[in-house]
Amino acid sequence: MVNYPHKLSSQKRQPSLSQPKNFANRGMSFEKMINATNDYYLSQGLAVIHKKPTPIQIVRVDYPQRSRAKIVEAYFRQASTTDYSGVYNGYYIDFEAKETKQKRAIPMKNFHPHQIQHMEQILAQQGICFVLLHFSSQQETYLLPAYDLIRFYHQDKGQKSMPLGYIREYGYEIKAGAFPQIPYLNVIKEHLLGGKTR
């Protein structure tokens, strides 16, 4: 049988028996969702939080054409601390964002000693510090306070990963929304500040 483009196929389609799919934020990376959330917070006058640039030292550049430069060799100037920082209602905010496809744990190799030390320094200065953890296969996002990450890091130094059970016990689930997409300020206000704002 010939199926012309303007004709409907005479074959009947079998209904799909697969699970319903969640197409919310499809194709958008976790980092882009956080950036969109931060843009929303800024536009609404709620917070000023930005992604920190990674300092890079450019060593060699090729010029294949006069108008085009191509960086061929570059190095990180220093180890990066955390991904985001800013101010919310007079409080200093500093956080790291991690995404994993794993279903039951987040790899601890994603957290480096200098990042843990940086988080300890933020907490010592009464700053608000945490990690946003996104399990992409389950579409679950959690805010884990830095002191719970630090405690796990020091207690279980040999562990290869932090179990999802630990994150669910000590962290706070963040339900994705439209505006903002990852409403983490709600968790900060309710759980880390006890409902108080300055």
Swiss-Prot record:
Coiled coil: none annotated. Its cofactor is Mg(2+). The record marks K98 as: Transition state stabilizer. Its main location: cytoplasm. Endonuclease that resolves Holliday junction intermediates in genetic recombination. Cleaves mobile four-strand junctions by introducing symmetrical nicks in paired strands. Promotes annealing of linear ssDNA with homologous dsDNA. Required for DNA repair, homologous recombination and chromosome segregation. The keyword Hydrolase applies. The lineage of its organism: Bacteria, Bacillati, Bacillota, Bacilli, Lactobacillales. HAMAP family: RecU. This is Holliday junction resolvase RecU.
